[in-house]
């Protein structure tokens, strides 16, 4: 059986890890980095770039570079968070036929899980390159406060990427696993404060020794799925735009290219201000007007940044209070505080956490990698590599159904340990009612309409009877991924109706299958593209080496031989302009045969001159053999030019 990998699918960055023996190993990507930007770009010539390559070209291609798509996953277009996002991002967000928020790129409509799947494919390939074997199974993390639709959409993204998602686990829980696995055995209560690129979570977790097992039990969780580092960046960007407007009288907000450059610089400035007291945002030629080009040069102090984001930091404290209250604990009961997510590197955030919990947060957990490490540990538990670890997670929000008068009746309260089941008997509201609509809701509000609608279904053919007489049993069943199944049964007839809750919109099975096929086709396309580039590079090397040999040997090459070589050269150059790999390889072989004797002569000439083996002959010989490895590197540069 292949390895199950652990993936932290983040808003800003993603990370992949795998168990090696009793330790989780974070895997470096092809660029040598341990985290990968969660960015996907679609270039003019149809190429899809993921990660650092996509981030590098964002400035020149803002409308077709998708970032922070996790904030859209599993969301309806009408949701206030989506409406807010539309104003902040340069790419187009539109309302899909099913009411979800989708994106449109180069006239192609795409669902957020499709975009996230591209990032997951990159993480999958990173793991496969390292392990040297195919990977088909993964544990993927989500913010603890993700609702059912968002979890289902994340599972869909995994499926589209060619991964069987063995488990969806909550990010703070994963971080606690990473922190607690190698700690001394014994009972402790930890608070995980997770402020990432797009989401905020806080979980109160008890780590205990139970019958020889290391048990991680989530006592309570809370959060905000639309609060993170991206919002901190936006506060700084807004400030810089205003300052520039005051100085130059130009509003940069209507210029996507300028805004993309500004986004990049604001993020860098924010990071720099975590370790220095002030920094310069220096952007020459940011824009131009009739009087000529304009440059931005604005000093930003740490104090200024802190004042801009103070309200955002304050917003993280309320969920901490609620989580503690729900866990039935006070601040003094917490033994350790763990910081997760890149935004927790900001000193002001650390101070706020320290002031609230009354203790220094732990510094021995890598905020960028802890979640992926925890996911890999959970993957190890599922794969049987990690023994004696038990993870007890909770459902973040209450679940129930709409009852008479538009009220939400809760069947499962928030912070209930999962997996779990709950059953309740309801009846009809009218005489001779023969059907009951079960409207499933998630949230904490009393009014049904104020909660998230997860879906609805009908139980029909109830025998006519006075109101209140029929007995309809509704059962909720939440699995270990936090995903809900609901069934309703008429106790008189035994007739039952059940559904796996998909978002009231969500992707249908057919849509997911279509996206899986698209992704597979894209993988084949990528492979063909790499093979074509490798063939081109090998041909290019041979052309260069042959021309060098011809020049070096001069008149020593007979006219007939020279003509044959030049003809083969010309044919190969022509083939290289096209996209036919087989044609390029055939012409390369023809040139190699025609120019084969040149290498020997150059070698003999150099030996006679005392320079054995160096120069064009050696170069040509190697070009005729194998240049595929070099081609990998050249291909990347080639596409970025």
From Swiss-Prot:
The modification Phosphothreonine is found at residue 199. Residues 617-626 have a biased composition (Low complexity). Residues 577-641 are annotated as: Disordered. It holds the Pfam family HSP70. The keyword Iron-sulfur does not apply. GO terms for molecular function: ATP binding; ATP-dependent protein folding chaperone; unfolded protein binding. Residues 577-590 have a biased composition (Basic and acidic residues). Residues 627-641 have a biased composition (Acidic residues). Induction: By stress conditions e.g. heat shock. Keywords: ATP-binding, Chaperone, Nucleotide-binding, Phosphoprotein, Stress response. Acts as a chaperone. Belongs to the heat shock protein 70 family. This is Chaperone protein DnaK. It comes from Thioalkalivibrio sulfidiphilus (strain HL-EbGR7).
